[in-house]
């Protein structure tokens, strides 16, 4: 099954603010989510969210098997991403 990767508007804005070389690496990793989203990332404890590590950055996403899509909810530096993400959800 191939999943569509959808960026939440907040994730898209955060991705645009990241340095281009790092942003390119993140986009490469996001492409891998299309085929096997549960194998690429790591499930966050006590939630239905997943985390993808790309150097010092993390991508927080959710897998919707019913719609065959991966929703990227947040992108940020590892020092702040989980605190910032918890404030949103």
Regions found by a protein language model. Name each.
Residues 1-5, 24, 54, 62-89:
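Enriched for short, Lys/Arg-rich terminal
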Residues 7-11:
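Basic, amphipathic "hinge/linker" alpha-helix immediately C-terminal to the N-terminal HTH DNA-binding motif
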Residues 12, 24-27:
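Generic alpha-helical structural signal
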Residues 12, 51, 60:
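Short aromatic/hydrophobic contact patches that present stacked aromatics
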Residues 14-21:
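Surface-exposed, Lys/Arg-rich phosphate-binding patches that contact polyanionic backbones
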Residues 19, 37, 85-86:
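Short, flexible helix/strand-to-coil boundary loops that buttress conserved ligand/catalytic motifs
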Residues 28-53, 82:
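A short, surface-exposed loop/turn module that caps and links secondary-structure elements
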């Amino acid at each position: 099954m191939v999943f569509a990767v959808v960026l939440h508007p907040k994730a898209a804005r955060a991705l645009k603010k990241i340095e281009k070389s790092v942003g390119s690496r993140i986009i490469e990793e996001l492409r891998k989510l299309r085929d096997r989203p549960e194998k690429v990332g790591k499930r966050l404890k006590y939630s239905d969210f997943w985390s993808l590590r790309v150097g010092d950055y993390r991508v927080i996403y959710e897998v919707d098997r019913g719609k065959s899509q991966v929703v990227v909810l947040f992108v940020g530096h590892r020092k702040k991403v989980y605190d910032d993400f918890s404030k949103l959800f």
